[in-house]
Amino acid sequence: MRYRIFLLFFFALLPTSLVWAAPAQRAFSDWQVTCNNQNFCVARNTGDHNGLVMTLSRSAGAHTDAVLRIERGGLKSPEASEGEIAPRLLLDGEPLALSGDKWRISPWLLVTDDTATITAFLQMIQEGKAITLRDGDQTISLSGLKAALLFIDAQQKRVGSETAWIKKGDEPPLSVPPAPALKEVAVVNPTPTPLSLEERNDLLDYGNWRMNGLRCSLDPLRREVNVTALTDDKALMMISCEAGAYNTIDLAWIVSRKKPLASRPVRLRLPFNNGQETNELELMNATFDEKSRELVTLAKGRGLSDCGIQARWRFDGQRFRLVRYAAEPTCDNWHGPDAWPTLWITR
């Protein structure tokens, strides 16, 4: 069974003069489309697929940079004895042959990045009802596929051009706008001096003092104070405040490393409109990645971690800025946070 949580199904319209694309995430019946600020779009079937998923991704611009994957998998791998999927594919109950020699075929994964092969395959299946596996209960519902392809065409402004998947026209490939310039959030002080024992103790004492004044529902005995060096003169302090079945909310401060200690709260603000009342995100299941020097937040849609929002934030010397935002609204046992589709990326 699959579940769907409400996350971001469509972002408010943004001025076209912006130098980045407006992120978008939409559901069309049994298909889901996500396009990020680079106008890179990825679509996949949802529904009750039971571990058989077709994923189609395409970059913005005149070039035909697309990849089509049909995969048998999920959070739990198939049994080793399960047969290969290529000879078992059926389209509306009839054998589905993979034409051409541009497919890379392995037992549970079929991939092609050849433009002509992808176009021919989509034309063959887009009016169908479902792709299934012989002797299996796996299903790729095709309900919504055509609408999803049209949405990608519209988002990337391909409608009326030779490169469109649905509404083709005579406009040349170069009429399609290129991907916006990729924003950069530089790493400040990438190798800060580690906290000394004295600094760590001072910060922990400060955190315990702050904790006594917090209005948090989490039992004081379960609250934790975590500190880490952020720069040579600043530290990040996080205190757990609220907890549910699978999500914990932290409060965080940027604290000076030298006495007298001074602090200011960490605010995580999205650089785009997410369709909610506020663009601020809570520090949910927050960790600090020492290797990438990024603050990572993960809002789980359920305990399996197959749906939710994962964001990565980088300190620019003044505040944490978003460097990656991925969201998976469909809870269907397909993939974990690191594989969720992105709505925002940076260098």
From Swiss-Prot:
<dbReference type="Pfam" id="PF06674">
    <property type="entry name" value="DUF1176"/>
</dbReference>
<dbReference type="InterPro" id="IPR009560">
    <property type="entry name" value="DUF1176"/>
</dbReference>
<protein>
    <recommendedName>
        <fullName>Uncharacterized protein YpfG</fullName>
    </recommendedName>
</protein>
<feature type="signal peptide">
    <location>
        <begin position="1"/>
        <end position="21"/>
    </location>
</feature>
<keyword id="KW-0732">Signal</keyword>
